[in-house]
Swiss-Prot record:
CDD domains found in the cross-reference section: ATP-synt_Fo_a_6
UniProt topology in membrane: Multi-pass membrane protein
Family: Belongs to the ATPase A chain family.
Lineage, top ranks: Eukaryota, Metazoa, Spiralia, Lophotrochozoa, Annelida
The species this protein was found in: Lumbricus terrestris (Common earthworm)
Subunit structure: F-type ATPases have 2 components, CF(1) - the catalytic core - and CF(0) - the membrane proton channel. CF(1) has five subunits: alpha(3), beta(3), gamma(1), delta(1), epsilon(1). CF(0) has three main subunits: a, b and c.
UniProt protein name: ATP synthase subunit a
Chain's role: Mitochondrial membrane ATP synthase (F(1)F(0) ATP synthase or Complex V) produces ATP from ADP in the presence of a proton gradient across the membrane which is generated by electron transport complexes of the respiratory chain. F-type ATPases consist of two structural domains, F(1) - containing the extramembraneous catalytic core and F(0) - containing the membrane proton channel, linked together by a central stalk and a peripheral stalk. During catalysis, ATP synthesis in the catalytic domain of F(1) is coupled via a rotary mechanism of the central stalk subunits to proton translocation.
Length: 231
């Protein structure tokens, strides 16, 4: 029995069900599924648009400057598929939700953001520095705008990672509360139990959509960061 609603985020609570570390189990299961997928076995050009999911992510990447940066499309598409699977696997009862932890989301977003920053400054330091000053700004506002823009750029990996972790955590907390209320109402009122179960089913379907949307937004923002890359 779990002592509180936040116990679902503790990997050590699942040791009785899963002898191995749950983070290791979920992450490596996703990696194995990715390796075995036919997407990575067949020719990339012919298989990239085979499914609506592939079409969605590659269409978004083609709208940004990702197409001009060789080697960036593959990591972003990999992260997208991995996040979709991990988010959906986190909805399975008694399964550890990896994407609800800031350490995991930050380990995905920070390296991509840092690589973009290093690449743009190595390619053209002057153009990269010029991005910190918006065009057409008054001279007396330039120091403040540069400070604000610099701060906004450097907090991007934190806000990106926190957005995914917070949205996934909120959904799991609500599901935990619904489970507690359903268990309490099971022995009191049949009508209340039926209503709670129907509500829980509807919310689970809503969470499935959230899992897909959050994975898409995560990769969408990473691809939009490439628009600031100097060319």
């Amino acid at each position: 029995m779990m002592p509180d609603i936040f116990s679902s985020f503790d990997p050590y609570m699942f040791n009785t069900l899963f002898p191995l570390n749950s983070l290791f189990l979920v992450t490596n299961t996703a990696i194995i599924l990715m390796i075995q997928s036919s997407f990575w076995v067949l020719n990339a050009r012919t298989s990239a648009f085979k499914s609506p999911v592939n079409d969605t992510i590659f269409t978004q990447l083609s709208r940004t400057s990702t197409t001009h940066l060789k080697g960036l499309s593959t990591p972003l598409s990999t992260i997208f598929f991995m996040l979709v699977m991990i988010n959906l696997m986190g909805l399975i009862p008694y399964m550890f939700s990896t994407s609800s932890h800031l350490v995991f989301t930050l380990s995905l977003g920070f390296p991509i953001w840092l690589s973009l920053m290093i690449s743009t400054f190595a390619h053209s330091p002057k153009k990269s520095t010029a991005h910190f000053l918006p065009d057409g700004a008054p001279d007396w506002l330039n120091p403040f705008l540069v400070l604000i823009e610099t701060t906004s750029v450097f907090v991007r990996p934190l806000t990106l990672s926190f957005r995914l972790a917070a949205n996934m955590s909120a959904g799991h907390i609500v599901l935990s509360l619904m489970g507690i209320y359903c268990a309490a109402a099971w022995f009191s009122s049949v009508s209340s139990t039926a209503l709670l179960i129907l509500t829980a089913i509807g919310y689970i379907l809503f969470e499935v959509a959230i899992c897909l949307i959050q994975a898409y937004i995560f990769c969408l923002l990473l691809s939009l960061y490439s628009d600031d890359h100097a060319h």
